[in-house]
Structure formats: C-alpha cells, structure tokens
A protein has these predicted regions:
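Flexible, surface-exposed loop regions and adjacent strand-edge segments
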Residues: 62-69, 174-177, 209-219, 302-316
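Residues embedded in well-ordered regular secondary structure
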Residues: 1, 37-169, 207-210, 256-263, ...
Length: 350
C-alpha cells in the first residue's frame, strides 16, 4: 500500500534490536520503511512515470487432441467399454462414436479423422482453449511530488496513481496513494513532525473456480485443462455447456467472466506525529542525549464482494452473493531515549 516512489530507505531489524524497540511484536524481526521527507531549498516539483507490459508464459506440457484421445480409448478399453476386449487394442469407429460422439460439434473434430473406415490421427481437429485465458498485461504508474523548505520548516507531498490490467481477462488493480510529511523546528532544541500515508485500492480478482465439476483454479488454468478436441460453441455460435457429453462434470468455463464478480476494496491510512527534544542544545554536558515521543495511528477498511450468477458454474443454479467488510483501528505510542557520544575520536557510545 506504499507508493515505491515515496520510499527513501528500507531497513531490517532482527534479534535484540527489534525486540528492544517493538517488544513481542518484533520477535520475528521488523522491516522499517522510511518514506521521503522535505529537504531545505526551493520548492521543487517532480514527476515519475512508468509503463510496463507483461505476458503469461506457460511451460506446462499438455497433451494434444490426438494424445488425449488415445489415452481415453485405452482407459475405456481396459474397463471393457471400448472395442472388443478379446482382441488387441486398436482405434474403433463404433467405439469412438459411443465414447466421443455425444456432442455433434465436438465430435466433428474426431469424425473427420476417420476416412473410409481408417483412422488418421493427423486429421484430428483441436481447439485452443487457453488462448481465451491470456492477454497482454499493461501497468502504468504515475507520481507527482513536491518538496522544499527552510531550516525551520520542511515539507514533502506526493500523489500517486497505479493502474494494472492483468495477464488474465477479468483481473485488474487500481490504486491511489497520498503521502505528506512536515517537520518544524520552532525553537532550536525541539523538533516537531507529522507524516501521513494514505492509499485506496480496488482489485478485480478475476474468476476462481470453487466447484469440483471443472476443478478449482483460476480462469486460465480452467480453460487450459479443457479437453483439446472439444469446442466451446456450436456452429451457430451458441454456448455448449457440456462439450464432452460422455462426462457431464466437464463444464465449459469460457463464459464464466460474465456470471461472476470477485472484487476487493482496501482503504488504509497510517500516520505518525512526533516531538523530539535535544538536551545537548540546552546544556553542553548532555550532548548526544535526545528524547522522542511518537504517536502512530492506523486506520484500515477492507471489503470483499463476491457474486455468482445462477447460470455460472459456481452459481450452479442459484444466485449467490457474499459480502465481507472489516474495519481496523490501531495505534502505537513510543517513548524513546537516544544517547550517542563519541569520545577521543575513536570510541562511540550509543
């Protein structure tokens, strides 16, 4: 939820250093992210923008249509459901009609491989299901920031926008960020400061199959797992629910994006107000001794909304909706004492 353009530094604390400051919460280590602050000088405006492209590259080796048909035939033959069990296994037209011929448009891809009673595997047709589950992902991010100040007052502010189109249809992310920080020194020993980071993001998660009929997984993998010789639409362009009629659990997922919504919204504000007093600027013997009190509130609102229409696989004949909101309010109050002293140029206490 932090704009990368606002990050000044990242520090990892572990072991005693993390528990000394954060107690039990820091037992597994702490990652400190320091955001940018104002610097002395004239006010400067800065813009940073990026555009990136991404693609889904799948190295999984899948069976082609001919290979799949051969394995399905052999499985049926071993169960006594294909050909003549008293003869050696071989392609059989009548067996193919019984096993694969329930849906005419899908069957056409196999039927065309039978010429004059002879099976020609190189003539089997196939359909590229996976092509419907991929697209070129585009991400563009823009940040406008301003910084400046004097030795008495410094300020920094930025506004960021990110939009991402995922490599799968139906997936997207949009985020707005706001970062402000001010630091003032009204009198020499005292420093006052305030920082705030706010973000608002919406994510379209895309389709996730939760029913066992097609197999759980995302949209691309559901499509990529479909039987390669089957087709999603008939010759008139109508949707085919069961492309392989022999198995009613194989359901066509190609239109599922129309029937399902899976959206998350997240709004978050982190703030920090602090005062730091340098005792060394009041009395020379206390040089290096500083006290800091810091208050950090955190507000978060999260919402998950899922809707599955009755016509979809997850809906399974019923309109189903799920709405889960959550709110979080937390704060920390730190009282910190620092002492850093160098003695005889080579010895440092702190």
């Amino acid at each position: 939820n932090i704009n990368p353009q606002d990050i000044e530094s990242i520090e990892v604390l572990k072991d005693a250093s993390s528990t000394a400051i954060y107690g039990a919460r820091g037992a597994n280590g702490v990652v400190l992210v320091t955001t940018k602050k104002g610097k002395e000088g004239k006010v400067t405006l800065n813009y940073a923008g990026t555009v990136t492209f991404s693609t889904l590259h799948d190295v999984t080796k899948m069976m082609n249509a001919t290979q799949w048909i051969d394995y399905a035939r052999l499985a049926a033959y071993n169960q006594g459901l294909y050909g003549d069990k008293n003869q050696d296994f071989a392609p059989d037209y009548e067996g193919d009609v019984k096993l694969f011929g329930g849906q005419a448009d899908s069957w056409a891809n196999i039927n065309q491989a039978w010429v004059d009673g002879t099976y020609h595997p190189e003539l089997v047709g196939s359909y590229d299901w996976a092509s419907h589950g991929k697209q070129t992902g585009i991400t563009h991010e823009h940040t406008l920031s301003a910084s400046g100040g004097t030795d008495k007052f410094k300020g920094y502010g930025s506004f960021g926008y990110l939009e991402q189109k995922g490599v799968q249809p139906g997936q997207s992310y949009q985020r707005f960020t706001l970062n402000t920080s001010f630091e003032a020194r009204p009198v020499d020993p005292l420093t006052l400061g305030f920082t705030m980071n706010a973000s608002y993001g919406t994510q379209n998660y895309g389709y996730n199959f939760s029913k066992s009929v097609t197999g759980p997984g995302d949209y691309y993998n559901a499509l990529n797992s479909m039987i390669p010789w089957t087709v999603p639409y008939d010759s008139d362009g109508n949707y085919i629910r069961n492309p392989w009629a022999y198995n009613v659990n194989v359901i066509n997922p190609i239109d599922e994006l129309k029937y399902n919504t899976n959206k998350r919204t997240n709004f978050r504000i982190n703030g920090s107000a602090y005062a730091q007093f340098d005792f060394g600027k009041v009395w020379k013997p206390l040089e290096g001794l500083q006290y800091r009190i810091q208050f950090g509130p955190e507000l978060q609102y999260y919402r998950l909304g899922i809707a599955n229409a009755a016509d979809g696989i997850n809906g399974d004949g019923r309109n189903v909706a799920q709405y889960n909101p959550s709110n979080k309010v937390a704060w920390t109050l730190d009282n910190l004492v620092y002492y850093n002293k160098t003695i005889a140029k080579n010895h440092r206490i702190g």
